């Protein structure tokens, strides 16, 4: 859909950012799946759930007969917390959380190595968000599937992620393990995001000071920065002068 202006996208050691061979496309469509932001908009309203989930099986011929296909669909429904009889229903007959479970089932049935979850909980109620994220964690522990979890809710990002990358205006500003980013955020944009998270502890919440960040007035130029090592696997993109200044800042009080 878009031609990259710079950089490469590597998956399993193969460059998938440009034109791909048919074999690479087939491999990619088997090994990489997507969970979309809006569960209602991403499900065909005219198809039953069994056909929505089974579409990938049909395209890639992953079953021997109709009975095996039916069994695979019902097994994946059970894995995501839905009943086998839900297979014959249409998307409008489900709640938002249930529809997102259908979307997760559609991705999982292909046994992918990577699932890209694009703001997959932002359209759901808070209580339902927790259910969906817990489901995704359980599935990951069971199957070993990797997630690229795209979100703006950093409390959920902290809960589900092993590593975090902070993006702004198309630039990767800071990367590290969840502990490294949350314990020692360096970039002003990262600090502003983390300082905005309310604390459930009233004592900590009273001390919390939300930092503001405006790229236009910050004097920071993302194109001039280079990768600087903070510690371990924690890196920040900045100039030498910015790195020296930011490393002197006091730790945040946000948790």
Task: List the predicted regions and their residue ranges.
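Short catalytic/signature loops enriched in Gly
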Residues: 178-246, 250-251
